[in-house]
């Protein structure tokens, strides 16, 4: 089928239309929410990262330079995205807890040297693995990715990269968890190396200060607004008592609870997480990262995603799907406003004028949050990607192809 001429012109036309819609949404978005006297009751002064012409043009230039585009596998593997979406949904129907680990895998991959599937590589005689970095020891869902990759290889051997597979699987995980859809370009290539040392030091810890978190996101091009929106993924998944017990019993080595914790919530948590003499600050991140992770139990799990220490109580971050799927994200921000954030790094979002502003905005306007979260996930999923000859397409996501 021809459209306004040949295929290349059609692709350019579609790209311009998509960018125009994307920009128009943000103009409407700015008009509705970034003016004084908003529905959120917050006077917004920070500019959207998409507000000015320079950013709009830079997005267009990036598309011109990039090998990424929509429907990249249209000819080489036309059913690729459908296969990935169906596989994640089929697994979700059996194991609903599959979504948070896949979303967390995406973050832990993209945050370290970009979205190149390096987090999926196993160690071998010559290379270390990011899986062995302490922040990644609780990562789950590798077997889910392997299962989907196997399906793709049966249909289109050696075509779909693990990096594309992971970003598309994470998008489907967001959808089944009640989050928004967002369009993704494809054409990423896989890294031939892993970056364990970077993963060890760059992934934010659960007790990281707000300044450290914002600095690490800023280094990767995310402003406060986008960073806060990504934290909304903490409205699903689980975390272990081990990783916040110090807030209940020995905050900052005072022998007392964190004074910022809501008193009623504190008592609720103490009931679920009784005191033990080993209570101290965790040395590794919890099963909730940015985004969160891990199924709440192994009883419904057919993919080996064990919940770590079975003797350690866990907290359901959705609080039994409080408010329903339509409150994906917003329930998290509302609880922060009530001083009911589990991690210090969560509650600290209320400790800065700018981040608090966005917490309140997202808590009061689910549509605003869903738009912002979708845009931030698009940005995260395209961070520092490998394209063209810079990467490879692995046939097994855990093993790099031999270098020529």
Curated annotation (Swiss-Prot):
Its main location: secreted. It comes from the Eukaryota. Its EC number is 1.11.1.7. Residues 1-18 form the signal peptide. Ca(2+) 2 binds at residues 235, 287. The keyword Mitochondrion does not apply. Residues 276-307 are annotated as: Disordered. Ca(2+) 1 binds at residues 109, 112, 114, 116, 118. The keyword Translocase does not apply. It is found in: Secreted. The record marks 104 as: Transition state stabilizer. Belongs to the peroxidase family. Classical plant (class III) peroxidase subfamily. There are 73 peroxidase genes in A.thaliana. PANTHER family: PEROXIDASE 25-RELATED (PTHR31235). This is Putative Peroxidase 48. The lineage of its organism: Eukaryota, Viridiplantae, Streptophyta, Embryophyta, Tracheophyta.
């Amino acid at each position: 089928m021809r459209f306004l001429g040949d295929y290349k012109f059609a692709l350019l036309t579609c790209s311009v239309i998509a960018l125009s819609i994307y920009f128009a949404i943000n103009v409407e978005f700015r008009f509705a929410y970034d003016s004084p006297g908003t529905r959120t009751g917050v006077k917004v002064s920070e500019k959207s990262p998409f507000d000015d012409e320079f950013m709009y043009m830079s997005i267009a230039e990036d598309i011109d330079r990039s090998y990424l585009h929509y429907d990249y596998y249209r000819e080489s593997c036309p059913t690729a995205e459908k296969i990935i979406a169906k596989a994640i949904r089929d697994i979700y129907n059996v194991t609903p807890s599959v979504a948070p680990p896949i979303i967390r895998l995406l973050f832990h991959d993209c945050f370290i040297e970009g979205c190149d599937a390096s987090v999926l590589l196993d160690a071998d005689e010559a290379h270390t693995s990011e899986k062995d970095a302490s922040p990644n020891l609780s990562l789950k869902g590798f077997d889910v990715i392997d299962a989907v990759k196997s399906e793709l290889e049966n249909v289109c051997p050696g075509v779909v990269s693990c990096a594309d597979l992971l970003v598309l699987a994470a998008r489907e995980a967001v959808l089944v968890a009640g989050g928004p859809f967002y369009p993704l370009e494809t054409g990423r290539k896989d890294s031939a190396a892993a970056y364990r040392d970077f993963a060890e030091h760059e992934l934010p810890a659960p007790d990281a200060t707000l300044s450290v978190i914002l600095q690490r996101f800023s280094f990767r091009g995310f402003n406060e607004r986008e960073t806060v929106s990504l934290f909304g993924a903490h409205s699903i998944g689980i975390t272990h008592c081990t990783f916040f017990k110090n807030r209940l019993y020995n905050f900052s080595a005072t022998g007392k609870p964190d004074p910022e914790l809501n008193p009623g919530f504190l008592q609720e948590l103490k009931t679920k997480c009784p005191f033990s003499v080993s209570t101290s600050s965790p040395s590794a991140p919890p099963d909730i990262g940015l985004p969160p992770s891990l199924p709440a139990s192994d009883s419904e799990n057919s993919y080996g995603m064990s919940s770590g220490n079975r003797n350690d109580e866990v907290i359901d971050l959705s609080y039994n799907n409080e408010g329903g799927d339509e409150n994906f994200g917003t329930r998290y921000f509302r609880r922060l406003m009530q001083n009911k954030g589990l991690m210090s790094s969560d509650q600290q979002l209320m400790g800065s004028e700018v981040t608090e502003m966005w917490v309140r905005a997202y808590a009061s306007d689910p549509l605003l949050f869903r738009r912002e979260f979708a845009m931030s996930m698009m940005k995260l999923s395209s961070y520092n990607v490998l394209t063209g000859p810079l990467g490879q397409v692995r046939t097994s996501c855990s093993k790099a192809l031999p270098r020529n």
